[in-house]
């Protein structure tokens, strides 16, 4: 890639600071007009297909809801909305940063990108916390793993993300450059310092904190799963090995999609005001543009993750009749304070052990069959 960098007031044709306003260097970004249309097109097709299938299973085949399935449903809704908006960006970048649509539509497309990004992060965090409770505190997970609690948490996530991303609708704008109309993904020059401050707050609140929570949850889960059970010898059981692989896969995908994007975007915004060489700034700009498709790819990877982690959903898609979920035993209900039947100590220990093993598939209860956004 030829650098071909010149000062901001250069008169040759090209793009300045990629597709942003107020930058001092001109970048040759021919790679972007191939990379972004192709990658967004693939994400659009795969994301829509996978998430539509997931929504069909959730709405038409799944009869019993728990916390994990509730969070996955909302995750699929968010991914579907974002994938449906990608054809506009495919057209935009294929035309060489020309936006023939309205400014309102430009704002909406950028808003959907960030809304999907942070909804995915927060819903993955909710799923991680729920799984962590299921491994570390099975009986507490039995009580708090019901869909009615998860629906309330999901509603809070939507309200929080929509409120936090509402300023994007104010900052994002369009501008005319010769015969082209550019749809910026930041702000106008006079508002850029405010946009950087806003983005820094979002970085900490909606990425750094959830990522730390997910990391802690999966470290605790891995320690518990890798610890041999009392009185056993040899390697890990097959179920535990699969759980450990799932943990590693979730962390890897999370880091692949979200971490590079946030790191390069932070550098991209921070270095714009510094007196660095255009070659250095060009490298940072290129890295940021390359990680944007990675952030979008979570719309395709989310369904794969929860299909792999939740084999019950695969069985629901394959079988004509979903399997009947087990109900909490009287002993487990007694420990949760629901009622206190008299049982022998031996039977109590036996059933409690069974409950701990099946915590992951705890039913949400009869009142959780209706799902509301």
From Swiss-Prot:
GO-annotated biological processes: blood vessel diameter maintenance; establishment of localization in cell; mucus secretion; phospholipase C-activating G protein-coupled receptor signaling pathway; positive regulation of mucus secretion
Name of the featured protein: P2Y purinoceptor 2
Positions in the Cytoplasmic compartment: 60-70, 130-152, 221-246, 310-373
Effect of residue 265 to L: Decrease in receptor activation
Protein location: Cell membrane
Record key words, sorted: Cell membrane, Disulfide bond, G-protein coupled receptor, Glycoprotein, Membrane, Receptor, Transducer, Transmembrane, Transmembrane helix
Function: Receptor for ATP and UTP coupled to G-proteins that activate a phosphatidylinositol-calcium second messenger system. The affinity range is UTP = ATP > ATP-gamma-S >> 2-methylthio-ATP = ADP.
């Amino acid at each position: 890639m030829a650098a071909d960098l010149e000062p901001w007031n250069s008169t040759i044709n090209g793009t300045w600071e990629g597709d942003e306003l107020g930058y001092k260097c001109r970048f040759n970004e021919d790679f972007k007009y191939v990379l972004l249309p192709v990658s967004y097109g693939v994400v659009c097709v795969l994301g829509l297909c996978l998430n539509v299938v997931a929504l069909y299973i959730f709405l038409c085949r799944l009869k019993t809801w728990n916390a994990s399935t509730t969070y996955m449903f909302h995750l699929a809704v968010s991914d579907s909305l974002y994938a449906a908006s990608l054809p506009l960006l495919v057209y935009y970048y294929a035309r060489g940063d020309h936006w023939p649509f309205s400014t309102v539509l430009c704002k909406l497309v950028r808003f959907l990108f960030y809304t999907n990004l942070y909804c995915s992060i927060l819903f993955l965090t909710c799923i991680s916390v729920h799984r962590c409770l299921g491994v570390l505190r099975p009986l507490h997970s039995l009580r708090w793993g019901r869909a009615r609690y998860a629906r309330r948490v999901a509603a809070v996530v939507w309200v929080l993300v929509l409120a936090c991303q509402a300023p994007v609708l104010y900052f994002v704008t369009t501008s005319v450059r010769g015969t082209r109309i550019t749809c910026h993904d930041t702000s106008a020059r006079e508002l850029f310092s405010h946009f950087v401050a806003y983005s820094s707050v979002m970085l900490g609140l909606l990425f750094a904190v959830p990522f730390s929570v997910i990391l802690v949850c999966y470290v605790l889960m891995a320690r518990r799963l890798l610890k041999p059970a009392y009185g056993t010898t040899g390697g890990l059981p097959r179920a535990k090995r699969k759980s450990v692989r799932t943990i590693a896969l979730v962390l890897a995908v999370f880091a692949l999609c979200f971490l590079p994007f946030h790191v390069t975007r932070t550098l991209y915004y921070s270095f714009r005001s510094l007196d660095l060489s255009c070659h250095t700034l060009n490298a940072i700009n290129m890295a940021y543009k390359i990680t944007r498709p990675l952030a979008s790819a979570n719309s395709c990877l989310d369904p794969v993750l929860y299909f792999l982690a939740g084999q019950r959903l695969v069985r629901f898609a394959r079988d004509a009749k979903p399997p009947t979920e087990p109900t909490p035993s009287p002993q487990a209900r007694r420990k949760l304070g629901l009622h206190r039947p008299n049982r022998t100590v031996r039977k109590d220990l036996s059933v409690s052990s069974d409950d701990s093993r099946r915590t992951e598939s705890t039913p949400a209860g009869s009142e959780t069959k209706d799902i509301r956004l």
